[in-house]
A protein has these predicted regions:
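Residues lining hydrophobic/aromatic ligand-binding pockets adjacent to catalytic sites
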Residues: 105
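Conserved nucleotide-cofactor-binding alpha/beta core module
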Residues: 92-95
Length: 280
C-alpha cells in the first residue's frame, strides 16, 4: 500500500515479507516491481531507504517512485535499481518527463488527468517507456491525514482495521472511493475496447490498478486483459462477451475511461467514439 505506513500487512513495512515476495515472483518467472510511498514525509525516508535496500539486494526488476527526493536517493545510493515514475509524480508535460529521465527514470506514468492525445505528444518527445492504465480505480489524490479516521468515533472505526473495508463518497450521481489517506475514482477505468487502438499507437506497458482490491479481482481481471492483449496482437481482435461477464461483477459502480479522451473522468466512451453510460 503506497498511501499509509500503518496499513495492515503492508510489505513496505514488513521487509522480510517483501524480500520473500520478490523471491517467489522470480521463482515463478515473473518480474517484481517494488513501489515506494506516494507522499513520504522526511521522517519516513529512513524506512524508504530500507525498502530500496531490500529491492536492490533482492534484485527487484524496478522500483516505482512518486517523489523527486526518493528518486534522488535511488540515483545516489542505489544506482543499480531501475526506476519507474508513478502516477503521483505529477507528469503533465514533456519537460517534466524529460527531467525524470535525465535523473535516471526509464518508465513514465503520466498523471491520470492527462489525455491520451497529450500522452502521445509527451511520448513522442521523451526517450522512455510510457505506462498506460488499462483497468482499475484511478488514483486521484493522497494526503497525510486519514479521511476515515476523521470521523472514526462516529463511524466506529479504528486503525488499522478501518481501511480494510470499502468506503465510497457519494454526491448525487458522483462517487469516489476513500482509502483513508488516498482517494480513487469510484468507477473502474476500463480500456478493454480500446486495446487495439493503444497497441497501434505504440504502447506496450500497461497497468491494472488493484490497490485495496481482492485477490479474485487481481487474478480474474488480469486474465481477461492478458487474453485481450494476446488476441489484439495476433490480429484476431474480437470482444468476447465473457470478458464483460468477468469484469462487471468486480466493478460495482460501473466503468469509465478516466480522462483519456478529454472528457469528464466519469464517462465511458466506446471504441466507436460514442458516449455511453456503460459498455453495451
Amino acid at each position: 500500500n503506497i498511501y499509509c505506513r500503518l496499513y495492515e500487512r503492508n510489505f513496505l513495512e514488513a521487509l522480510d515479507d517483501l524480500r520473500t515476495a520478490v523471491e517467489i515472483l522470480h521463482a515463478a518467472g515473473k518480474k517484481a516491481y517494488v513501489s515506494t510511498y506516494a507522499a513520504p514525509l522526511t521522517p519516513d525516508l529512513d524506512q524508504v531507504r530500507r525498502v530500496l535496500e531490500v529491492a536492490a539486494t533482492s534484485q527487484a526488476d524496478a522500483v516505482e517512485v512518486h517523489n523527486l527526493g526518493v528518486l534522488r536517493i535511488v540515483a545516489q545510493e542505489f544506482p543499480s535499481l531501475r526506476v519507474h515514475m508513478g502516477a503521483f509524480a505529477n507528469v503533465y508535460t514533456d519537460l517534466t518527463a524529460r527531467k525524470f529521465v535525465e535523473l535516471g527514470a526509464t518508465r513514465i506514468t503520466p498523471n491520470y488527468e492527462v489525455s491520451l492525445s497529450e500522452t502521445d505528444l509527451i511520448n513522442s518527445r521523451v526517450p522512455a517507456e510510457f505506462e498506460i492504465l488499462l483497468h482499475g480505480k484511478m488514483p486521484l489524490g493522497v494526503s497525510e491525514s486519514c479521511f476515515l479516521l476523521t470521523g472514526a468515533s462516529t463511524l466506529g472505526l479504528s486503525c488499522p482495521e478501518a481501511c480494510q473495508e470499502e468506503y465510497f463518497l457519494h454526491y448525487e450521481d458522483w462517487e469516489l472511493k476513500s482509502l483513508g489517506k488516498g482517494v480513487t475514482s469510484g468507477r473502474d477505468v476500463c480500456m478493454l475496447e480500446h486495446i487495439p487502438h493503444l497497441l497501434a499507437r505504440g504502447y506496450r506497458v500497461f497497468r491494472i490498478e488493484t490497490i485495496s482490491e481482492t485477490p479474485a479481482y487481481q487474478s480474474e481481471v488480469g486474465r481477461v486483459y492478458a487474453d485481450a492483449i494476446a488476441r489484439a496482437e495476433s490480429g484476431q481482435w474480437r470482444i468476447k462477451e465473457e470478458w464483460w461477464d468477468v469484469l462487471r461483477p468486480h466493478s460495482s459502480h460501473g466503468f469509465c475511461n478516466g480522462f483519456y479522451f478529454g472528457r469528464s473522468g466519469r464517462l465511458y466512451i466506446s471504441a466507436n467514439g460514442a458516449g455511453a453510460t456503460q459498455p453495451a
